Amino acid sequence: MPKVKDTSASSKALNVIIYAVMVFSLLICIIPFIYMVSLSLSSPKAIINNQVRLIPKGINFEAYKQIFTYPNFFRAYGNTIFYAIAGTFIALCMTILFAYPLSKTYLKGQKILMKMVIFSMYFAGGLIPNYLLISSLHLTGTRFAMLIPFAINQFNLIIMVNFFKALPQEIEEAALIDGIGYFSILPRIILPLSTAAIATVGLYYAVFFWNDWFNGLIYLNTKQYPVMLFLRNIVNGTMVLGDSSSASTDTSTLSISIKSAVIITSTLPIIVLYPFLQKYFVKGLTVGSVKG
């Protein structure tokens, strides 16, 4: 009996430590975000006097007004929504269609293909060769430059391959016995069992396409810019918002508010999306890492 009590006591102590670490990690992540929200909603006077903490002082929506009233803001936001949705859909289709045959060990050349995938993870072509390739395909200046070249990510591909490997082979054999054709197994049997991995990989792709601004800077014209590139130009001061005749002090403090509002505006959609996919996220990662 004493040993049971000691085990129980040590288990409780361990749980307390784990919860304390988790709460501390949560605070590290959430406090800066709350502070950014507070800065974006505070008045210039409160910012000048360094009165802003976690609660806004002198509620002021001028920063958001400056961003939302800019002529090209909603066009850029619409571009990003298109890139995120279309890019994620195309990437998932390409990744699944490549990962499923790679998960079959009886496929001729399967090991060579996997080695090529892993090799390309560590030794990429580089910026200039990629630009020359995309330019030779006449994709520069088109929205496809943000979608087609990034349709498959090696890390996401490996997750899907390992997930498909973890599925029992007997399921496919039973489906064939029941009369389901080879071309129907993937959409009718495998994909319904792979929602966790698809949601995980889909979230990775969505975050990538949502945050991608560098490729837009290289390949797109101004009207096709994603919102991240639009907001980056605001933060860097290459795009002027508001009345240029305003006082310098107000301009500097408003700039702080605008930069904070930019952070909130750009990250909020992903933060809102994540809780809906959280239940699939951990499962998809753990199951996708069972086999190598």
What is the role of each PLM region?
Residues 2-292:
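A hydrophobic, multi-pass inner-membrane permease signature
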